Amino acid sequence: MPKIVLEHVTKRYDRFYAVDDLNLVIEDNAFVTLLGPSGCGKTTTLRMIAGLETPTSGKITIGDNVVFDSEEGINVPANKRKVGFLFQNYALWPNMTVYENISFGLTNIKEPLPKINVDARAEAGLLKALKAPNEVVKIVNECYDKKGKLDENKAMIKLIDAYELSQYSAKKLLGYKLHQSKDAKAEAEKLAAELEKQIESARNDAKAKGMELNEDFVYTNNGEVVKEERKLTKEEIDLAVRRVSRIVKIGMFMDRYPAELSGGQQQRVAIARTLAPEPTVLFMDEPLSNLDAKLRLEMRSELQRLHLETGSTFVYVTHDQMEAMTLATRICLIDNGDLQQYDAPLDVYNMPDNLFVADFVGNPAINFIDAKGSQEKDGSFSLDIFDGHKVRFVPNDKIDINEWYANSNAQDQKKADELALKASEKGYVERGNKEKAFKYHIAKVDEFEDYGDEVELTENDFVLGVRPEFINISDKAKLKGEIYSSMPTGMETTVRVAVGPYLLTGVMFGGVVYKIGDKANVEFTGNNVILFSRKNSKFITLGKLEVE
């Protein structure tokens, strides 16, 4: 499967930059989720890769093919990019059966394809089934109802799935009536001998024309596959439909109409239709958002399995961070048209690049705590939190905060210089939706809008990020508080603890019940507390937090 590369891709609507200077590499066979709030540019990015939206500038490469290049004037149409697109709405034809919906795109394909002896290939499929006649008989006998009548449709579906046959070959196999024969083995051997003769005859005919039939019954000439511009045959279309129906488990619904299916079944049909032409890349734009919570969870599991079985590259758009965390091999988090972080899900969760990423990923949300202080000689940080509580932050890895700020400031200056250079170029349009500092939320007992003056921040201002699972309630803890709310959900309970005017959210495991108003002492466990710069919102390091 191909690698996808985006280089300096920008999409602008007048002064609004939907996507700004995006650089991204999606490795082959990856499952990448484009994550972000509504209107951040994730769907625009997906549509540009698929060819449904034309970028303002930049370059997009799929595999070895450049599909868009603003400088070279290249823009390959969507139907030539060999990609599949799965939409939020299933977009199934209501007047067509499931089979007709899946096969619809296949019937319109006309392009140079390998020349195949379809009859010989079908005969080879039957020959494979006849090598195990007792198994065929067993499958058919399982399809008799209580009245002793054979359910031919059920028998055909089972034969199709067992031997990967088309419906035409399965019908022929059922027509041999091995299940009614006194000696199924002898009858199968007789039929197999006849099929072998026909296959050998097809090979001889190919040789007479100066060609050969390979193992897949594709015509070759001097080892090269012979191609011809043609449409897919009925046999090829049916095999493709049956192949994808096996993957998404909808073989029994082929004769039904969309209105007769549940939401989950309709989504499976839409997935099968997208997979049928064997796209090199599969794009999905919030495909599960119309399903209820239980079905959404089930379909997430199916999509994981689908990715493994097809070996395709998946690019998936969602605003649901739970979907992104559970499905993706890498998360591409976008906000206001800018790439915020591109990493493995656990790296995004544990080591967010900035305050926005930390806030967006995680449920319940991360606890932010304002802190002020400085680094000590031993490398730890002596900080004040919660209006006077003294804490000590011990980094996991050695870090010099002055050196960190010097590197960070140099990066910011380089970015500013690049923007100034771009602004001086002819045709540059100033960005209307400029990047703004993220306003993180400090949870308090009495919430109110703060209209006071902006605080002048220094390099001694920090923000601590503590995930709810690292908040613990213990009698031995030094930070005193009381239970503000308690929400048990079985084996875990989400608790909010008031520490003075501030609120901390924790997740307690083991089915413990807490009573609102009870005293509760809080401590910070583990070494995954995150230290951010309050001045520039960037991630500094991970460490442990000790209350003094």
Feature map (PLM): residue ranges:
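The feature captures the beta-strand-to-loop junction immediately N-terminal to the Walker
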Residues: 35-37
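ATP-binding/catalytic-site motifs of ATP-hydrolyzing domains
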Residues: 59-61, 65, 338
